[in-house]
């Protein structure tokens, strides 16, 4: 059938991929399309394995177009120093913050990373900041990012300067993490109901959450097995 690529023909595939690169470059630099720029970055990274060029496109698309997904990936490049980018957690923090506040693809993940870096403190001049960490974990949790809900729960279990210990809030976020499929959110919530920590004791609810944790753990193991096949 005309128009279909014969993926068994190495030369035809190479020509097809080269044409994609030209098309994405045109979208990015001639049409000024931020999505085209991100497609170009994905192409350079995934097809060409040219991480230096990828980093340059990501930087352009983040700084000029404030593209959330490109800012997120640029932040990840700065965390590891990939593609010739300076390995710098402060710069990574700025990229993640920009992505988080832009509210596009990967913005929720970026908000979570802002929370992690604020909690760790190495990206901030003033050191660890639990207040900022909580703020961005809350933003990511509201966006349905389970690890942020779980992290909020652990923050309230422990208590930190500027964040009072609160077992009812710890339970609230553990339950939300559980609802979003986080194994340890379910496990922690189960234990709280079993002990009556932050809530009245409820053996039945504790058992339900324990079984939910077991089911999620089993699903994770099954996914890992399938991935390894």
From Swiss-Prot:
Sel1-like repeats lie at residues 34-66, 68-104, 108-145, 146-182, 183-218. Residues 197-229 are annotated as: Disordered. GO terms for cellular component: mitochondrial intermembrane space. InterPro entries: HcpB-like, Sel1-like, TPR-like_helical_dom_sf. SMART domains: SEL1. Disulfide bonds: none annotated. Keywords: Mitochondrion, Repeat. It is found in: Mitochondrion intermembrane space. Its main location: mitochondrion. PANTHER family: CYTOCHROME C OXIDASE ASSEMBLY FACTOR 7. Belongs to the hcp beta-lactamase family. May be required for assembly of mitochondrial respiratory chain complexes. This is Cytochrome c oxidase assembly factor 7. It comes from Danio rerio (Zebrafish). The gene is coa7.
